[in-house]
């Protein structure tokens, strides 16, 4: 283990997968949009990941050669979000940072994506920022913040038992 400040940019990029709140779609092929995260991935791995995130319909016409973005197929917000999750999972880093990864997804798709992330990232570190409480029982540690301050932390069961802010949020659902 070494301090993060001593790591090179290349090492940091290799070590971290990110699902940003604002996902960028490049005007390029579907393949190119995925290879950004995993440059050496084969077509089978790319197609399999698209299927895992529920985007297999993107493969129907031109497959991985389908043009996305300007001059090509536009993606809905939910499709864009799932493409970002596919990129992050393909990157296969030991640390994943997620910023509102399921924003705009319906409840069923949100549950599927959180289950997939949990499965693929087993024994790895996931840091997720969210305002939604669905799926948090899968996490080992939950930190509840208010105005930039930590007000509670623990696992799902502990936080419910304390009947604090997390419990109050859950009661409102």
Regions inferred by a protein language model and the residue ranges of each:
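Conserved "ABC signature" C-loop
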Residues: 23-67, 116, 165-168
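ABC-family ATPase nucleotide-binding domain "signature/switch" substructure
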Residues: 13-22, 30-33, 49, 66-162
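ABC ATPase nucleotide-binding domains
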Residues: 171-173
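ATP/adenylate-binding site constellation spanning eukaryotic-like Ser/Thr protein kinases
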Residues: 9, 13, 55, 163
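ABC ATPase NBD Q-loop/coupling interface
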Residues: 1-11
